Amino acid sequence: MLGAVTVLVEACKKNDLTTISSRYHPTYLSFKIPAGWPQPPTDIFKTNPLTEEGFQLGKKLFYDGRLSKDGNFPCASCHQQFAAFATYDHQFSHGFNNSFTFRNAPALFNLAWMKEMHWDGGINHIEVQPLAPITNIKEMAENIGDVLKKLSIDSVYHRMFAAAFGDTAINSQRMLKALAQFMGSIQSFNSKYDQVKKGEASFTIAEQNGYATFQAKCNACHTEPLFTDNSFRNNGLSLDPILNDQGRMRITGKPADSLAFKVPSLRNIQYTGPYMHDGRIFSLSQVVAHYQTGIDISQPTLDPLLKNRLSITNQEKVDLVEFLQTLTDQVLLHDTRFEQPN
């Protein structure tokens, strides 16, 4: 009798899945590449079609503390929308059991243009990226199996997974795909700088002068329009003896990559401080000052472009900071589409 009941239950499950699949009509979304921007190096949605249902599921997961061990550290705890999905005013990420990481949380936008992620490039696909913080003992400190168990007892998730993927199965692949759809949709291309480029606004005199300085002194690494060339470079920061963070060399094992870190985008830089891979600098003026006088030119792996440091006047420095603030995308910072769901 028990066997018959088991067969009946399994049959019902299969019928339920078939019924849901027959009703699977997702709302497909297009991924916008702004005019004049390069094509992304890879199509992150090629095997993970972007849908409204997948996006909404990914957003719910992104803000859900149950992805962490104690429920207190969702992805959004370190990637806050008002800080361009970086961590506002915190040098290091704060995680489970009152732990801290040894790096500053990078901003999450325009990820479709990144072949490698993290300061050392240790992640090479957006669908893999969430695994690192979820399983890191100093961040979310959870294992994927337990995350899935917690999600599986929530009927809302059953409905959302079915809407996004065609049936109620909740597994790691689908969870990561949904997160990738949400994170990959976070784009920044609506700053004053972008409006100026489209002829919809004008720089002030100070901003225009700062832009000229930027083009002459900074654009080689922070290349427009992404304001990064996505390379890894040693920018002359002294090695913190406690952190002993060797940067890219931790991934490649190559001495030539010692102290090299990913060049961050300068978009939204007004709101993504503190700055550098370890958050050691707390103002844009101090960032510029580092390139003027703080570079350790004795380092053998120092990027050649920085050997002569940055030579600019005090007024050029002020104007440069004024220009950098035109890269703030207020649309992104306040877009209700990316807000925490109810």
What are these regions (language model features)?
Residues 1-4:
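Sec-dependent N-terminal signal peptides
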Residues 12-342:
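Periplasmic c-type cytochrome electron-transfer domains
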